[in-house]
């Protein structure tokens, strides 16, 4: 006999499944239904990039979304909903990402691509992390799977760098080799290295030579210089790493405009028996 809690969980899961099915087309050969329900040019309020729930709610039509795999690897969160009436999937990456988080994102992207649903990546991550030396191999495999999932996906792929985009996560989720369009908020930092690591590699001589400051102060000084001159959003735009620097309040409107533009996208992969998924 099922307990009351088990019955409630079954009802909740059934309702969530029904909501997910309502967002999916009948097959990959059909477009998902477009439902007009919200102002497409609506501005979003000032939101901390780290507040994923508030940001996703502000972007979605009516503030409504469905989170999938919520109990697993919270450094990557994945949602489904509508934006400008279009069915979309959202991958929100924040903090340091584990191998499990990368695999969670890869699985979700492949699920969205099965039905040709656009994927929007929200990036505010300072790189990847491992719990132990033994997990290093798992991390490499997970990174390969994430890159594979984004590279193979033919559905529209948009990215917004809301904070930091450091290392491999940016390359897979928001890099111009994979994303159709990448936007950045003005304060974004986009780099292969963290500012602290960049100082250790690129500014070691300057830190030693700066006798007017302590070592910690000199490191902080050159970390700020690295962000300003190399890793900031303006320099990323100049180098073609992002397509545009946008007003955060207009993020929803810019994404919907991009979805409308990419609505007729019909991409295909080269003919072959199957892709060689990194196992």
Give short role names for the model-derived ranges.
Residues 5, 14-38, 201-229:
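Charged, glycine-interspersed solvent-exposed loop segments at helix/strand-loop junctions
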Residues 8, 14, 132-180, 188:
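Phosphate/diphosphate-binding loops
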Residues 12, 95, 125-126, 162-163, ...:
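Short, ordered loop/turn segments at secondary-structure junctions
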Residues 12-56, 246-275:
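Terminal amphipathic helices with adjacent charged low-complexity linkers/tails
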Residues 51-148, 261, 267-279:
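Non-catalytic terminal/interface segments that mediate subunit docking, oligomerization
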Residues 101, 118, 139-143, 179, ...:
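Generic long, charged, amphipathic alpha-helical segments
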